[in-house]
Amino acid sequence: MSGFTLSDLERIVDERSKAPPEESWTAKLCAAGQPKAAKKLGEEAIEAVMAAVTGDRDNLTYEAADLLYHLMVVLKIAGIPLQNVMGELERRTAQSGLQEKASR
């Protein structure tokens, strides 16, 4: 099992976002702004869904990695740290999904 974490990915996205856009895809996406990054996130989500529906496990793994990466870029542009997302997940898992949904 890999020791690589989402926190590692967040750090890498942060570092690469500071590079010149012509040298880094991450920097290029960040420079293009949230509409471009969010569109790319949506494209990757669709590709992951298609891989899941067709049962292509290898492609689903590949597309899930793309999806997580692009989500981290969108969060970076929005100024939302991964810790905030993890905190929300922790809050939600403290109760059943049905209870959480009813509380909205």
Swiss-Prot record:
It is found in: Cytoplasm. InterPro entries: HisE, PRib-ATP_PPHydrolase-like. SUPFAM superfamilies: all-alpha NTP pyrophosphatases. GO terms for biological process: L-histidine biosynthetic process. It catalyses: 1-(5-phospho-beta-D-ribosyl)-ATP + H2O = 1-(5-phospho-beta-D-ribosyl)-5'-AMP + diphosphate + H(+). It is an enzyme of class 3 (hydrolase). One of its GO terms (cellular component) is cytoplasm. It comes from the Bacteria. Its main location: cytoplasm. Pathway: Amino-acid biosynthesis; L-histidine biosynthesis; L-histidine from 5-phospho-alpha-D-ribose 1-diphosphate: step 2/9. GO terms for molecular function: ATP binding; phosphoribosyl-ATP diphosphatase activity. CDD domains: NTP-PPase_HisIE_like. Its EC number is 3.6.1.31. The keyword ATP-binding applies. Keywords: Amino-acid biosynthesis, ATP-binding, Cytoplasm, Histidine biosynthesis, Hydrolase, Nucleotide-binding. Pfam families: PRA-PH (PF01503). Belongs to the PRA-PH family. This is Phosphoribosyl-ATP pyrophosphatase. It comes from Rhizobium rhizogenes (strain K84 / ATCC BAA-868) (Agrobacterium radiobacter).
